[in-house]
Amino acid sequence: MCGWPLLVLWALLPATAAGSPGRSYPHRVVLDPEGKYWLHWGRQGERLAFRLEVRTNGYVGFGFSPTGSMAAADIVVGGVAHGRPYLQDYFTNADRELEKDAQQDYHLDYAMENSTHTVIEFSRELHTCDVNDKSLTDSTVRVIWAYHHDDPGESGPKYHDLNRGTRSLRLLNPEKANVVSTVLPYFDLVNQNVPIPNKGTTYWCQMFKIPTFQEKHHVIKVEPIIERGHENLVHHILVYQCSSNFNDSVLDFGHECYHPNMPDAFLTCETVILAWGIGGEGFTYPPHVGLSLGMPLDPRYVLLEVHYDNPARRKGLIDSSGLRVFHTTDIRRYDAGVIEAGLWVSLFHTIPPGMPEFHSEGHCTLECLEEALGAEKPSGIHVFAVLLHAHLAGKGIRLRHFRKGEEMKLLAYDDDYDFNFQEFQYLREEQTILPGDNLITECRYNTKDRAVMTWGGLSTRNEMCLSYLLYYPRVNLTRCSSIPDIMEQLQFIGVKEIYRPVTTWPFIIKSPKQYRNLSFMDAMNKFKWTKKEGLSFNKLVLSLPVNVRCSKTDNAEWSIQGMTAIPPDIKRPYEAEPLVCEKAASPPLHGIFSLRLLTCALLLGSMLSSQGL
């Protein structure tokens, strides 16, 4: 039956056991707390290839879900039963009922089972044009996984019990050329014996001082250092640049982030300069760019923020994870810079309660970019990566780019944003920002479960709407943001007058009577918000004049700071090319041939196993 292909497989068996020939998987992550379920993946043109390695001799389930639950999910189930490989495309309805998909869009490439593990490799198109499949884009994806010790029977897969979970990942973040790190000097930003509380989520902050260098260095790569066994505990790591006006006393201890008693020094650490998220191998700068260290304007103090995810609420965990920063004196052509763009973090950023969808916009105005770039880099700067940032109510973020009233291609987007998964997105092509351009960070929120106003602020229950742009060459511009006018927001709820001069914060309402002597926060909460009122308020806020924030290093200001600007008149919005769906084609011949090889390989593996090989 197998003939000469069996001889080919015999020759290729050592390579095939490690994966199908010619396939590489630049990304990998362990999905379960016990290290039993590993996911590997990589992009191949308009397809995405996956490899699952799971400690089971039954079925392996994998899929994508809009919320991380089983409802309305796109699922594939595969394995090896009685020496034969199988892979089946399923979906679930809103009631979590599993149904076989009439359009089978997942293609099995390789399968293997031994006495302990099942390995399957498969691929699918990014956009299958199947209403029961999820399109795979640059946005965050909620991956769901499951396994069982039995293969499916005639009635389908058995219930997986507790052998299941979910994880947010960005599957299409393009990989960059690796840097050989073994010969590079490095320093570590690592926590020391942090006790992890037995609660679901903990954010731990620790300040560090960057080593003192006698000459300029470039950071060219950052890698995670995750304590062994904690691969599923450490969820993401952010590094913020802090004020340089400190002494080393701020380094004495760490503290829980966003806590009322955290050190005041933490509040000066506002700009994200490094980031890592679970599933990432680290961050590598482009070969012509590096993050400068050792010079007067470079970071001296930084804040390490580590998000610990402990859903099982395990007790007694002690962690010493962090980041390894590789640097070199072989200076690259350009210094990297970071610009924070979006909404200035303040109480003037307001979101009503009970809203299934509410939009906020933060403007990096043409006036700020005209002054800062016009003075420092008239030919423009080049963006190569972006980190999008909101808090728990955030559901989607887009960084839009305008030039002379025409919208350019999106700089970055995440339409399925997850606060618990943040990393820099590499741009597939660098994009140039010129003097006089506009940037808008557009955030979409959901406050259906909230009974009071949501305010801009540092707490995770407060909100932000920010983009961090990695670019070159570095200019003296660290923040390009805006604040909407608060008085016009208050006029919407009927406020007529406040007490002046303003001597208290939040300031106090004078009239009308129903708000008299209330703070503006209390007045906004007293207003009876309905969905209709919320939509009208949203329309108003997006049209308001904004106060320009245009900052240099260490909070120095460009002259445009504090001036009022009008949101841009968008004459021509960007229109992406529509996705054209055609009738699904038949599986390629090489796919059928591959499955024959798979069957032969499994028979051969069974023969070898029976002979003790």
Swiss-Prot record:
Broadly exprressed, with highest levels in salivary gland and ovary. The chain crosses the membrane at residues 588-608. It comes from the Eukaryota. It is an enzyme of class 1 (oxidoreductase). GO terms for cellular component: endoplasmic reticulum membrane. Cu cation B binds at H389, H391, M464. PANTHER family: DBH-LIKE MONOOXYGENASE PROTEIN 1 (PTHR10157:SF28), DOPAMINE BETA HYDROXYLASE RELATED (PTHR10157). This is DBH-like monooxygenase protein 1. It comes from Mus musculus. The gene is Moxd1.
